[in-house]
Every structure is written in C-alpha cells, then in structure tokens.
A protein has these predicted regions:
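Flexible loop/hinge segments at secondary-structure junctions
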Residues: 3-336
Length: 336
C-alpha cells in the first residue's frame, strides 16, 4: 500500500501576486463535486487573505450537478472529479455555441477511493506478469473499432484497431505452462456513462482505449471497486482495474508502460510527478466565450489556485496531490 504523507507542492510554481485589488462585494459561485469541498475551502481561505472583498457561495453536492449549473448561469465554476461527459459538452455547445473552458486544478490520489484515484491494474499474485503496456491493456479490455470521438466531437479514424489486436489468452502476453491457454477474465466498472462510478471507466477509455467505447464483450461489470477486487481475488486468471485501496493479499498491481516508454509502478511518487500513465485529475470548468477575457475576479481566483500557495493548500487539506509546475503553467495560459 502507498504510505500516506503530507503532499507539499514542489518548487517551480509561481507565487501568487495579485494583479488587481478586487472591489467588493464580489461573490463567486461554485457547484459540483462534494469530494472537492476541503480543497475548495482551503483555496477560498487562502485567496481571501489577498482579496478580502471576495466571498464564495458553494453548492458542492456532486459532480453530476456541475455542468447543469454552469450552463444555467447559476454557477461561475463547475467543480468536477472527472472530465466532462460528451453529452454535457453537447448541451453546453447547443446552448452557448461554445464549449466550457477546462482548467485542471489538482492531481488525483494514489489510493483514496473518494479522491479521483489513479487506476490500478490488478492481477493475482500468482500471475507471472509484472507489467503491461497501454497498448496491451487496450487489447485485453477493448475490441475492434473503426475509430473514436474526442472531447471536441472530432472523429479520429487513427484510433481504429482490428480484431487481430485483441488479447484474449494469457499465452498471447507471453505466459507459458499452465497459463498459456487460459482465457483472460476481465473485470471493471459499468461501461454506461450514467453510472455513479463512470469516472474511472471514462478515464480508462480515454487513457487506454484512445477514447474508444467498444469493450471486450466478456467484460464483467461491478459498481464498486471492492466488488471488483473481491472477484479478482477469487479468480486466478482475471485482470481488472480499480483503486489501489482495494488491493488484497491475493492481488498485486502491475506496472504500466506508456507508448514507447518503460513500465512505471503505481506509487505516491509516480502519481505526484504524473509519470504513472493512469494518473487522473480534477477540474474546474468555466463558461468563457472564445476571444473574450475571463471575468477578472474569477481569473484572479484561478490564478491563485494554480500558484505556489494554491497548490500547497492542496497537500495540506484534501487528500489530492498538486499538479506539476509545467501543467500548472499550461493551465494558467488558458486564462490569458
């Protein structure tokens, strides 16, 4: 298991320096993820030390409420513990004729089930494998497809793959002896986007299957990670994805190799530096009309969130991890 220690933002983040003094009273409204309550509270307290005229109104009852509040104009910020769904993007685009602006604000947890956990690929401890590539995971969990849609509703035929790339026995992964002809039993979360646990499934689709939505027809679906782990524990020839917190004495997580790279184990350090390929993130979405400036108070707050102080607040308060300095700079650029 990953040891739990305080997460401090590494060096390399810009300190927050107010670019204006906000005249009040100004109220910033947020709706969305109840998992982000502690982190949001820490950000608000830290920001108000610099901008005392700003107040906040938070209705954080669940990620599924976030986008509806944003496009109904009753929220300035949509806090989400998963990426926006295609349907949510479509509704926003139909109403506003543009898509919401996505700002990544924190890295998910290495092992907390309620903190946008990194996806652990679990197998039996008896399994000789120690690692898999993302391409191999696609072969195991996916099926032939003609392409995939991305978040901008663009079709990508280069994401296509044939049935010849399916991996259905352990022998196809190089295992010999008793394992050679054994079928790979696959376990995971429900594949419907309307499931309460759609976040892990959607992340797996994006990071492993290039956004494709054609799954191995033999995938066995479970609504909870513990149920996935329990099923894996009873099945020597199974593989599944869940939270590291669900690991049992009978299971082990595999190291995962990105395209063209070496396999990376799932540890706190590899999630923190985002080298583990199945690391996940949390987001704040705002309604910004392309070509127009972000509301000044909102821009100041998000600049604080992405600053050294804001990223340190994450480690002190929430169970999430800071971004890397480079990703924080990329997110700041979106606000310009």
């Amino acid at each position: 298991m990953v040891p739990v220690v305080s997460a401090q933002a590494p060096s390399g983040f810009a300190a927050y320096q107010p670019t204006l003094n906000i005249d009040g009273p100004v109220i910033l409204r947020s709706w969305g993820s109840d998992e982000m309550v502690g982190m949001m509270s820490a950000w608000e307290s830290g920001f108000m030390r610099f901008q005392p005229q700003v107040r906040f109104s938070d209705k954080l009852k669940g990620t599924e409420t976030a986008q509806a509040a944003l496009f109904a104009h009753i929220a300035d910020m949509a806090l989400m513990s998963r990426p926006i769904l295609p349907l949510e993007r479509h509704v926003m685009f139909r109403r506003e004729h543009h898509l919401p602006l996505e700002i990544m604000v924190a890295t998910g947890s290495p092992e907390a089930s309620d903190r946008t956990f990194a996806l652990a690929i679990m197998v039996s401890k008896d399994n000789p494998l120690h690692s898999l590539s993302l391409h191999q995971l696609d072969g195991i969990f996916g099926d032939q497809r003609t392409g995939a849609w991305d978040e901008e509703f663009i079709w990508h035929p280069e994401a296509a793959r044939g049935a010849d790339q399916n991996l259905r026995t352990w022998g196809q992964l190089g295992l010999t002896g008793e394992w050679a002809d054994k079928p790979i039993h696959v376990y995971g979360y429900p594949v419907t986007i309307y499931s309460p646990t759609s976040g892990p499934m959607l992340s797996f689709r994006k990071q492993v299957m290039q956004g494709g939505d054609i799954w191995n027809p033999d995938l066995q679906e479970f609504p909870e990670g513990k149920q996935i782990a329990d099923a894996l524990t009873k099945d020597r020839y199974a593989i599944g994805y869940t939270c590291l917190c669900d690991e049992t004495d009978a299971l082990k997580p595999l190291a995962i190799a990105p395209a063209g790279g070496a396999a990376v184990p799932l540890t706190r350090a590899t999630v923190a530096d985002r080298s583990y390929p199945l690391t996940r993130s949390v987001y704040i979405y705002i309604d910004r009309t392309p070509g127009e400036p972000v509301d000044p108070a909102l821009k100041e707050f998000l600049t604080y969130v992405l600053s050294r102080q804001g990223q340190q607040d994450i480690g002190r308060s929430s169970g999430y991890l800071p971004l890397t300095p480079e990703i924080a700079r990329q997110q700041l650029q979106k606000l310009q």
